[in-house]
Amino acid sequence: EYTVKVEAEGYEPVEVTGSELLSGEQSVQQVDLKLAEGAAFADVTIPDHTLFGEYPAKIPESEIKPTRESGEIVLSRVVIPEYIIVHDGAPTDSTARDYYVRYRDYIKNVACSEIYATWPDTAIRANILAIMSFTLNRVYTEWYRNKGYDFTITSSTAYDQKWIYNKTIYKNISRIVDEQFANYLS
């Protein structure tokens, strides 16, 4: 893990702690710069990767979800959205921030948070397909909206997949997501 400090004239400096680099893999660290109002650093801390960090276990869900007759929304077909809303915490955490994230960028982020870029190409492809399928299930069933929430998915491993704000993105994972963009398991 590395710390990245970014300074540019006319912008507030930013420090990103926890940026990951893997041997033999190219990565891109996104940094959001704000127009300068003061000189203080904006600190961003990227938590541990899910393969070695401590995160809550997935809460089991029934594979077949019962539908209610009370007007529950389920889309008529699978739609690959342009954006999704990621709730950065547990569904009931009203203090957690919501992020509007391009669907493609969300998939790249989750893949980089949950698998290693050094894995064999076929393993990366299989995991990305599973990540996209799980995400599209949440979109298609309007899972959280039907529970009264205003977001698409959470960043909590207890409920969904790990999404990390400003996560380091690996070039090979990014390329594979772009290649598999419209695929999913049904």
Model-predicted segments: where are they?
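Conserved, single-site charged/polar hotspot
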Residues: 1-186
